[in-house]
Amino acid sequence: MTRNTFRNALVAVLMVLLLGLPVFAAEHQHGDEVNDPCLGTTDKSDLEKVYPTKPPYSPYAGRNFPTRPFFGDTHLHTAFSMDAGAFGARLTPRDAYRFARGEEITSNTGQPVKLSRPLDFLVVADHSDGMGFFPLLMSGDPTLLATPQGRKWYDLIKSGKGADAAIDIIISFGRGQMPNGYPAPGTRVYRSAWQETIKAAEAYNDPGRFTAFIGYEWTSNTGGNNLHRNVIFRENGDKAGRVEPFTTLKPLGSDNPEDLWKWMAAAEEKTGSEVLAIAHNGNLSNGLMFPTIEAFGKKVDRNYAETRAKWERLYEVTQTKGTGEAHPYLSPNDEFANFELWDKGNLDGSVAKKKEMLEFEYARSAFKNGLVLEAKLGVNPYKFGLIGSSDSHTGLAAMEEDNFFGKTAPQEPSPERMTKAFFKNPKTGITVMDWEVSASGYAAVWAMENTRESIFDAMQRRETYATTGSRMFVRFFGGWDFEPKDADNRLPAAIGYGKGVPMGGDLRQAPAGKAPSFLVAALKDPIGANLDRIQIIKGWVDAKGEVHEKVYDVVWGDAGKRKPDGKTGKLPPVGSTVDVANATWTNTIGDPELITVWKDPEFDPKQRAFYYARVLEIPTPRWTAYDAKRFGTKPLPGTTMTLQERAYTSPIWYTP
């Protein structure tokens, strides 16, 4: 080989490697055939096969979008939470992760328990206030037992009245009346509990298989009004461990969410880890969760809206203490709004509910009011995605109707749990029965992979949906060019991402003459019930600043047998196969999957709007029916025995 030939060949190879293009030696630049002693003989057509310009044959090659949802729980308490421990929880964060990963363990009441299928991720979110308090109390700490409260709680627990102690602890905490010796950030006991929380997450985090997030619950509960947030770290323990959680009790903490957001900003700067906050149980806030005029004595202004929108990208819309999507008083034309409601009062039952509070407690009304605030302030503070989670205080994320292990240890399976009171406020008489506790819910996240970073990033972009316990798959896309034939494709996600935006996304100024169209699809839980219907809920604000909503049935099961009523437009019920006495049902009604393209028939391009999907399963037995069958317990009058499990997607917003 001559020196020039070798040099030209080397240049050609380097150009191919660096540019990815076929480059020919100078002496052959005017022809298609290459005949070189070093490279061999080939021609342009052969090289084009190596460097194709056409789409790949494999439809799965080069995908850059999520292909499956990951199911998990962002809100689980263990014995490290002071109220959970007082209620009888003995399971630790490590036990919680083992259970979520699919292991069989022993419950707080000595019963074997295992999930039907492992979860994909879990956040142990023990209360930041008093972390480590219960082990300290049970050890007989002299400082705590020297106080009347500490002695009272210790004696109650030791005498088998832990539930009474737990309720008294919650009430005292809500009043800011905790005893001396109470663990606070900076103390040895507190630091030890937080570090063990981090170590447990690090030990059970298994990228690609199971994600164990580091987090905690900030529990603002002043006056019994629930303003709780779960705080989650994106990064690992080496960063999260550089700070200790923010608490609510002064002087180190605050019950004002704006102070939590300030702490989050400082924590990100100090740790190098992103953090997010997820609010929950607006239904127990007595009108304080979604303010429109003022919050904590300050006006709801642009700064409030920007800050809340930055830190609170998600809202926990369903859990054991009820579902907070909608309320019949606010949505009288929605026949599915009356679902698993807790609407008697605030968290501790100290103040009864008034109807004027409801508007500021539920997600759908927050979405509507957010549109009004955006028009006024330029920012929507309530532009959040939706998830579900458990808020279980047992260490068990067991939110399955036939495998429900309650909210607290006393509500683990027993013949008595369905007929007992969950709590009763002696002053107001407000009572919530155990049967009213919901076996709900889970968070579904469309992430690229099962890692802390990927799931966190999907949460930040709001590509999430809530379920009440089912593991159905739900897709929801919005755009301007979806066509009915798109629903016939067996790979709808490729079309959805190609033509539009997914759940949690935004649509901007409408093209002339076009209305938004939506591609929505659902696939039943593999071991669950068939699907009744998919609905799209629209909310909008008109030129007068008044808000409106409408529920559309867009596709449904048994379509050949059911048609909307010609006058009301309502779809007839799907029916029911539930045998309550035997806690059984069959998939002989409904459909295993539903998909359609729907275009807004009443679109006004000048009006701000949001759209989200609600997917309903056919009726199935509630956990109370399983208890009645297995234990032979006679339900109390009014006990709900069946339900329609459901999913709520994050909205897609339209902004003109």
Regions found by a protein language model. Give the residues of each.
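Aromatic- and acidic-residue-enriched carbohydrate-binding clefts of CAZyme catalytic domains
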Residues: A146-N180
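C-terminal functional module detector
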Residues: A26-Y154, P183-G186, E196-G208, F213-L227, ...
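A conserved hydrophobic secondary-structure block that centers on an alpha-helix together
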Residues: A184-R188, A203-P207, T219-N221, V231, ...
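Short, solvent-exposed helix-helix connector turns and helix-capping sites enriched
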Residues: K161-G162, G253-N256, H393, T451
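N-terminal secretory signal peptides that target proteins for export/translocation
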Residues: M1-R7
